[in-house]
Amino acid sequence: MRSRKSLPPLPPEQACLPWHPPGLVAGVDEAGRGPLAGPVVAAAVILDDLNPIEGLNDSKKLTAARREALYDEIRAKALCCSIAEASVEEIDRLNILQATLLAMRRAVLGLRLKPVLVLVDGNQLPVLDVQAEAIVKGDSLVQAISAASILAKVTRDRWCERLHEQYPEYGFDGHKGYGTAAHLAALRLHGACEEHRRTFAPVAHVVSIARMAEPLAAARVAAAAQGAQALLLSA
């Protein structure tokens, strides 16, 4: 009797997932959990099996130019897609995890077609009224999640480039809001802008120092005014 050889495992990238029920499947991912500034952005994508997109992968593994090209192709070829965000105010009020899940929920609710299954990158699920499953490293394993990661990343990067025009002193077009040495140095020099997340430790530290310095600065201004008045009276 011939022995049966075991089949080789599927490659780790873009594996076919056999548990999908029949119907539309949406992939969901986010961008912007780690940065010190700006919203967290989420995207939901339902791909068209009859209109495949070559080169989908985790957005972090792609160059900026490749992400931009795929962004346009995804928007053109997907059955539907939706992009949503949670604001800086919501991040500071809810915390970054809950704000991320809120953005994901908004993205799914924004789809014009309702999926029967939602596949979410990571190990946490937003509150949804459809079946959902969290997949660790899903942005490398599931094409729809890869597509969502690209839409979310490009959308947030474009937001950072617009923010740079408003606040060029922080260099948002380069670090995209992440806590690089250059960004932290700009924070210390210029303080926090309106788009910085006050509950994130580096920003909270800068804000607290600024608040402690306010009474001292006010006292110096008052003393200078009193000195000027005294000089006028003595003249």
Swiss-Prot record:
Alphabetically sorted, this entry's keywords are: Cytoplasm, Endonuclease, Hydrolase, Manganese, Metal-binding, Nuclease
Top-level taxon: Bacteria
Q: Which Gene3D superfamilies match?
A: Ribonuclease H-like superfamily/Ribonuclease H
The UniProt record lists the EC number as: 3.1.26.4
**Catalyzed chemical reaction(s):** Endonucleolytic cleavage to 5'-phosphomonoester
Record GO terms (molecular function): manganese ion binding; RNA binding; RNA-DNA hybrid ribonuclease activity
Can you give the residue ranges of the RNase H type-2 domain? 23-212
Task: Give the UniProt record's GO annotations in the biological process aspect.
Answer: DNA replication, removal of RNA primer; mismatch repair
Principal cellular location given in the protein's record = cytoplasm
What cofactors does the UniProt entry give for this protein? Mn(2+); Mg(2+)
GO cellular component labels: cytoplasm; ribonuclease H2 complex
PROSITE patterns tied to this protein: RNASE_H_2
**What does the note accompanying the cofactor annotation read?**
Manganese or magnesium. Binds 1 divalent metal ion per monomer in the absence of substrate. May bind a second metal ion after substrate binding.
Q: Which residues participate in a divalent metal cation binding?
A: 29-30, 121
Checking InterPro entries in the record gives: RNase_HII, RNase_HII/HIII, RNase_HII/HIII_dom, RNaseH-like_sf, RNaseH_sf
Cellular compartments annotated: Cytoplasm
What the protein does comes down to: Endonuclease that specifically degrades the RNA of RNA-DNA hybrids.
Q: Which HAMAP family match?
A: RNase_HII_B (MF_00052_B)
What is the similarity comment for this entry?
Answer: Belongs to the RNase HII family.
Q: What is this protein called?
A: Ribonuclease HII
